[in-house]
Structures are given as C-alpha cells and as structure tokens.
Amino acid sequence: GQLALKQQTVNRLLNKIYSPISDAYSELKQL
C-alpha cells in the first residue's frame, strides 16, 4: 500500500511538471 501511495504522489508530481510543458509544446506545433 505504501509503494502505491508513493507512486501516486510521484505521478501527480510528474503531471504537475509535464502538463504545462506538453501544453506549450502542442501550442508550438500549431504555429
């Protein structure tokens, strides 16, 4: 259970970091 919780936290962190990046990336590709 502890490992799964840790994985969720890591995933959420990665999401927070990568979401703006991928958003900006898709905007760039539309230019």
UniProtKB/Swiss-Prot annotation:
Keyword Secreted included in the entry's annotation: yes
Role, per record: Hemocyanins are copper-containing oxygen carriers occurring freely dissolved in the hemolymph of many mollusks and arthropods.
Protein name: Hemocyanin subunit 2
Cystine residue pairs: none
GO CC annotation terms, alphabetical: extracellular region
Family: Belongs to the tyrosinase family. Hemocyanin subfamily.
Domain of life: Eukaryota
Assigned keywords, A-Z: Copper, Oxygen transport, Secreted, Transport
Subcellular location: Secreted, Extracellular space
Reported tissue expression: Hemolymph.
GO molecular-function terms, A-Z: oxygen carrier activity
